[in-house]
Amino acid sequence: MDKFEALKIWEHEYGDQEYAHDVIGRKIKRSDYLMNNQVGWVVTYMRPLNQGGTNDEGNTIILHHHTALEKGDNFPEFYVDSIKYIVKYEEDGDFYYIESSEERDDNL
């Protein structure tokens, strides 16, 4: 995805804020799209395309680049810092969202 398209998604999610936090709380900076630094971010899919996800607004999410690496193609569950997250689907609104299960797995 080019930066122009990514920034349209940023504006939809965060407005004109220069800084925000991804779903797990990692700080991201609007101008640092695709940058591999402390506040860099990417646009990715909650349900990966190779697992039946769709390339539309209801399936995209902005994540810190470290969060995106940890999530990878894991679906519907993934772990970040030993905390379990679950991707859920809201059929009425046709969108995915992520919830924390508050369950830690210290064996990871």
Where are these regions (language model features)?
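Histidine-centered nuclease catalytic patch
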Residues: 28-63, 68-75
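Short cysteine-rich loop/turn motifs with clustered Cys
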Residues: 1-42, 64
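Short, isolated positions within intrinsically disordered regulatory regions of eukaryotic proteins
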Residues: 14, 45, 99-100
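Polybasic, low-complexity binding patches
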Residues: 52-58, 69-108
